[in-house]
């Protein structure tokens, strides 16, 4: 059994999703939640909260692998920079604990879950719910984090079948 932590980074809310994957490649939901950073003071204090909060979750749930969504250029350059800082704080929390980090673009995640790189958030949330047998509507940030974890589980299973590392498997899938 392998435990995978998925992270959907954000400067106001960071999605956290944790799954267990068995030897056959089946995924089981363990935990999901948004790590809310608003109200934590200035931006630097929010990054500190992200670093420490994510570190606590890693210590509690003990994942073996971590997958994180790559930065995309959104509304403005300022937003993209803040997202990059949040992503950096999240990656630091992971590598400080000597865990491997695997990165996936939003289009790669959508392709892995829905079959279309241009799928919308509702389609991704729906597929996450089906794949993990979750009832009710998932909160967007947490659903995205679970989607990142599921994507990594799929890439990981493909890599094992091909006898290559995950980076090589993903480049062959596309």
From Swiss-Prot:
The keyword Cell membrane does not apply. One of its GO terms (molecular function) is magnesium ion binding. Its cofactor is Mg(2+). Its EC number is 3.1.21.10. Binds 2 Mg(2+) ion per subunit. GO terms for biological process: DNA recombination; DNA repair. It comes from the Bacteria. The active site is at residues 8, 69, 141. It catalyses: Endonucleolytic cleavage at a junction such as a reciprocal single-stranded crossover between two homologous DNA duplexes (Holliday junction). It comes from Xanthomonas campestris pv. campestris (strain ATCC 33913 / DSM 3586 / NCPPB 528 / LMG 568 / P 25). Keywords: Cytoplasm, DNA damage, DNA recombination, DNA repair, DNA-binding, Endonuclease, Hydrolase, Magnesium, Metal-binding, Nuclease. This is Crossover junction endodeoxyribonuclease RuvC.
């Amino acid at each position: 059994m392998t435990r995978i932590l998925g992270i959907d980074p954000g400067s106001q809310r960071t999605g956290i999703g944790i799954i267990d994957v068995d030897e056959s490649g089946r995924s089981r939901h363990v935990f999901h939640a948004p790590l809310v950073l608003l109200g934590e003071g200035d931006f630097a204090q929010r990054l500190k909260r992200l670093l420490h909060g994510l570190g606590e979750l890693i210590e509690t749930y003990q994942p073996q692998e971590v997958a994180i969504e790559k930065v995309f250029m959104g509304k403005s350059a300022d937003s993209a920079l803040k997202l990059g800082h949040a992503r950096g704080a999240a990656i630091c929390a992971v590598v400080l604990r000597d865990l491997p980090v695997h990165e996936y673009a939003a289009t790669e995640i959508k392709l892995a879950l829905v079959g279309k790189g241009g799928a919308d958030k509702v389609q991704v949330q729906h597929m996450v719910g089906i794949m993990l047998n979750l009832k009710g509507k998932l909160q967007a940030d947490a659903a995205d984090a679970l989607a990142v974890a599921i994507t990594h589980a799929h890439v990981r299973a493909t890599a094992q079948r091909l006898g290559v590392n995950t980076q090589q498997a993903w480049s062959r899938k596309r």
